[in-house]
Regions:
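A short, Lys/Arg-rich alpha-helix, primarily the initiator
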Residues: 1-14
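Residue-level signal for the short linker/turn that defines the boundary of a DNA-recognition helix
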Residues: 6, 16-17, 43-46
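Residue-level detection of the helix-turn-helix DNA-binding "recognition helix"
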Residues: 13, 27, 38-40, 67
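Short alpha-helical DNA-recognition segment
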Residues: 16-35
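Alpha-helical residues within the helix-turn-helix
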Residues: 13, 24, 53
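DNA major-groove recognition helix of helix-turn-helix/homeodomain DNA-binding modules
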Residues: 27, 44-61
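Short, charged recognition helix plus adjacent turn
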Residues: 53, 63-90
Length: 90
């Protein structure tokens, strides 16, 4: 559970979201989300789906991919978003 918890925390930090923001988006309390992010409780399938949707990732990314692989995907998504906002060569 620690690896998933670490992924949840690191991804949230990269997006710049607070635990309270993520918890509100999921319809749970901040302490309930804190438990998931700190390895005290495993997210349910429904919660995994909500978290994956929030970050535009798959549930499989959250559950099974190595942390570095997921972080690279997140960074690539952020670069794509920035490139759309600021076209290169302009």
């Amino acid at each position: 559970m620690e690896d998933i918890a670490t992924k949840l925390r690191r991804i949230r930090e990269i997006f710049g979201y607070s635990q309270d923001y993520v918890a509100n988006r999921m319809g749970i309390s901040q302490p309930a989300y804190w438990q998931k992010e700190n390895g005290k409780r495993m997210p349910s399938e429904e919660r995994f789906g909500q978290i994956a949707e929030l970050y535009n990732l798959s549930v499989e990314d959250l559950k099974w991919e190595e942390l570095n692989t997921v972080l690279i995907k997140v960074h690539k998504m952020q670069i794509e978003i920035l490139e759309k906002k600021v076209p290169l060569g302009v």
